[in-house]
Amino acid sequence: MKRIKIFDTTLRDGEQSPGCSMNLPEKIEMAKQLEKLGVDIIEAGFAIASPMDHKSVQAIAGAVTNCTVASLARCTKGDIDAAWDAVKEAKHPRIHVFLATSEIHMKYKLQMSPEQVLQRISDMVSYAKSFCDDIEFSAEDASRSDWAFLAQCYSNAVAAGATTLNVPDTVGYSTPAEMAELITYLRQNVTGVENVDISVHCHNDLGMAVANSLACVKAGATQIECTVNGIGERAGNASLEEIVMALHTRRDFYDAETNINTKQIYRSSKLLSTITGVPIPPSKAIVGANAFAHESGIHQHGVIANAQTYEIMNSMDVGIPQNTMVLGKHSGKHALREKLISMGYELTDEELESVFTRFKVLADKKKNITGSDIEALVLHRRNTAIGSCRLISHVVNAGDGVPNTSCIKLQREDDVMEEVAIGSGPLDASFKAINRMLGLDIKLDSFSLNAVTDGEDAIGEAVVKLEDANGRRYTGTGLSTDIIESSIRAYVNGINKMMEATA
C-alpha cells in the first residue's frame, strides 16, 4: 500500500480566503493542531508578502518539530532569501518555489518567453537548493499549460535539485479524468520523475477539487495539497478531511494510506472554524453537524438494527465527541480533566484552570454539561487571554416604548471603565458604549449567532467582523448561554485582536 503525503496549506492558501485571516498566536495554535493531526508538511505562509507573514512563518518553524515547514516563494532571489530566512530554524525546512507555465500567464502576467521561463526555473531551483535540501517546484496554472512544455519545465526543475513537483489546477478548471491523464503523462515524460514526489494542488471552482486530487492518487501522485474545511481563495481548495477519509474508507480502491490521525480531524475542523469565525456548513462531509445524522424513519430503523446499513464511517473515527457522560455544578476539576482526556484534549495546568473557571460559571446556568459544551469552552479558551480589555458586566434595557440602553463595564489592564449608550437595539447600544469608552472608530461589518450545543439552554457563539478606519478587518468570537453577553464578548474579542495587531 503506497503512502500519500498530506501537504496542508491552511495557513497560507487557506488564509487568503476572505474572512479567514489569523493573528500570530492563532496561527501557532493551528500549526500545533496540524502537527497533532499528523500532516506531513505545513505551508506556513508566504514569507516575502509582509513582515508579519515572515514573522509567522518563522514562529511556526520554531513551534513544530514533527512536520516539514515550508514557505512559498516566487522564482526570484529576494523571495527565496526571505523564505529561507523564515524556515531555516525548522527541524525539517522546505522552500516552495513557483512560476507560471501556461501561455496566458507567460504572455500577460510574466511577459516572458517559454525559453526564459525554462531558464528561470533552472536558475532559481538551483539557487534555492543552495540553502535547503528539500525543494518543491510548482508550475502555476499547470492544468492549462502545454503538456510537452510542462514536462520540460519539470525536467529542468528535477535537474536543478527539486525533490517535489507540484501540479496545480490553479483555477479549478480540470476534470478528474483530465488530471489523471496529465499525471500519467508527466510520469512518463519528465526526466528523473522516479526520484521525486508528484504533488497536486486542486482548487474547487467547479466543485471537483477533492475528486481531482483522488483521481491523481490513482494515477500515481504521492502528495496532496489541501486545507482544513477546504478553505481557500474563491471557491476554496481540496478539503483535507474529505481527502483523508476517502483514502481511509476506500483503501480497497485507492490502495493508499496517509499518516493522519483521523481522530484529530473534527477537532482540527472546529478549531479552525472557531479561530476564523467561519461556520462549518451542517451538510459538510465528514465534519458537518448532519454528517452522521439520520432523520428518515427508514434510515433510523436501519442504523438501529445495524449501523453499517447507512453509515460507511463511525463518527468516533474522526473524533466527534460522544455525549455519553454529562457533568454538572458538583463536578470537580479532576472529573473535568478526565473528560477532556477522553475527548483527546491534554491541557496544561494553567489552561485547565482557565477552562475550569468558565466551566463552573456555565454550570450555574446550565444543569447538564455535555462533551459539546466542554469542547466549546476549550476551543474558546484563548479569547479570555487575548488582549487587554475584559468584560466585567453588562446591563441592557430594551423593549417597546423604551429607549434601548446598555451600560458596559470593562477592565483594561488596571483601569476599570464604565459607559452608557443608547442605540437602535440592545447590541447597537452595547457596541456604541464600548466604542465611546475606548475612543474607537470602527465599523461592524457583519454579525452572526449560532447555537454550538443542543437544548433550550444551548451555548450561543457570536461572531463579529470589525473594520477599522484603514479598512483592515478583524474577527471576534464570544461564547455564552446569554446571546447578548456572547455578542458583547465577541465584540470585545475583536477589539482586542485589533489592538494587538496595531500595537
What is the role of each PLM region?
Residues 3-4, 10, 245, 251-420, ...:
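A mid-to-C-terminal "edge-of-domain" accessory segment
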Residues 4-6, 16-41, 54-63, 77-198, ...:
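Alpha/beta enzyme core
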Residues 11, 46-47, 72-75, 99-101, ...:
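Short, ordered loop/turn segments at secondary-structure junctions
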Residues 15-18, 105-107, 166, 224-226, ...:
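Short small-residue beta-strand/loop micro-motif enriched in glycine and branched aliphatics
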Residues 174, 180-305:
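Catalytic alpha/beta core domains of metabolic enzymes, predominantly
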Residues 473-475, 479-503:
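Mixed-charge, glycine-accented linear interaction segment located at domain edges/termini
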